[in-house]
Amino acid sequence: MASSLGVLFAFLSVLHVVVSHGASPAQMYWESKLPNTPMPKSIQEFLPEADYSAQGGSKLFLASGGVLKSKTFSYKHAGTEEELAASSNADIFFFEHQLIPGTKLKVQFSNTISKAKFLPANVAKSMPMSSKDLPQILARLAINPASAASKVVSQTINDCETPSVSGEPELCAASLEQMVDFSLKKLGNQIQVKSTEVEKVDRAVQEYTIQEGVERFAGSKTVACHAKNFAYPMFMCHAAATTRAYSVPLVGANGSKVNAVVACHTNTARWNPRNLAFQMLKVSPGSTPICHFLPEDHIIFGSSN
């Protein structure tokens, strides 16, 4: 499906971009709202160019083409037999007590960051994001309603509309400004922001060893923003008071180094009882904290208080 979507999206461009050496509006917004918070490399990859002008009248195009395909999972969904079989050779989920130096985990860190950029704030605000507006959304994106691309868009919109299983506040953000505003509203202005950084991408599953220096870096409140599959960068951000975030240094069997971010969910009682995590770890909902690494294109905001 990815290749067919790529052919479609390669012809689309949301903005006529004029290269400039200045800071983009999104970057300036970050610096004004979070002046003492370094911007993670993963967010920098999504920043639009410094100068741009919208083209195409009422038609909305893509930021820079390409299919945005991220490795993610949903707490709301049951894991299929196919997913379980495909995940059997990697430690996608693990326990919090394993976060100690010397622990070995089989992990795949694949670079899922796309060349597509965040929408400008005004464009993101103007884009509808509800199932009832699906025909309008597909029309603005020039997507055939019968295509595979339409199914991707429809599924993500549905995910954005479906209430959180735990009642946590959620927002689907298509601009950096939306992501920052949501995080500030939920956490206050004393914030740390981190994402996984991989020194050398090895797309194969390999064994990584946890090194000295594991640290819990956020307070009791976090906002996690997970990249979704969509026609342009879209992040599902959710506020949580039951997630512990860790910075975990790793070294792979091939010598590659990773500064990984780990999220440990302490309350899984309301997750789908057939969720892939429960099947892989052979535990029941709510019985124990469940942890996972964050892909490179996922971000965690944490209160530093």
Specify the residue positions occupied by each region the protein language model found.
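Intrinsic-disorder-preferring feature that marks N-terminal prepro/targeting segments
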Residues: 1-178, 196
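Folded, disulfide-stabilized extracellular/luminal domains of secretory-pathway proteins
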Residues: 123, 127-128, 132-305
